[in-house]
């Protein structure tokens, strides 16, 4: 069961990284077909990447070494990522004020891409929540095993 959870976590991390790289290299899939518009990640997006990208080697190692204790690391990283992505999403929805200085022309509150309420930080939030839930599930199973 834990191996399936680790594989699910690996798929989530790979999809998140590929999605992140796709948006920064190609941008909106519909606009890119015609104009070649890509998105420059804001500083909050970069911090989200800093929390997401290192999860790939950690999850791969945990999968092959069958090391359940690395779920503490994935849980902590995804927990921090949940707060960061949630904060970023609330800034975009104009619910919170951005207390960080943004680069000119690369404001964190600007919604570059959306489908209804789903924006790039919302996708990041969903990924971190799912990784956190999988990590906690593995940790609960580890505790029951003892």
Where are each of the predicted segments found?
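Secretory/periplasmic and organellar redox-cofactor proteins
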Residues: 1-44, 51-146
């Amino acid at each position: 069961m834990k191996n399936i959870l680790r594989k699910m976590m690996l798929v989530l991390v790979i999809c998140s990284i590929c999605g992140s790289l796709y948006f920064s290299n190609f941008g909106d899939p519909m606009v890119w077909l015609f104009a070649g518009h890509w998105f420059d990640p804001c500083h909050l997006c970069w911090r989200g990447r800093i929390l997401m990208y290192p999860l790939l080697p950690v999850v791969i190692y945990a999968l092959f070494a069958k090391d359940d204790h690395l779920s503490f690391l994935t849980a902590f990283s995804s927990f921090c990522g949940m707060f960061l992505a949630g904060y970023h999403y609330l800034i975009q929805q104009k619910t919170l004020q951005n207390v960080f200085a943004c680069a000119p022309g690369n404001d964190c509150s600007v919604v570059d891409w959306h489908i209804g309420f789903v924006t790039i930080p919302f996708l990041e939030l969903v990924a971190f929540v799912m990784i956190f839930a999988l990590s906690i599930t593995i940790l609960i199973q580890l505790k029951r095993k003892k």
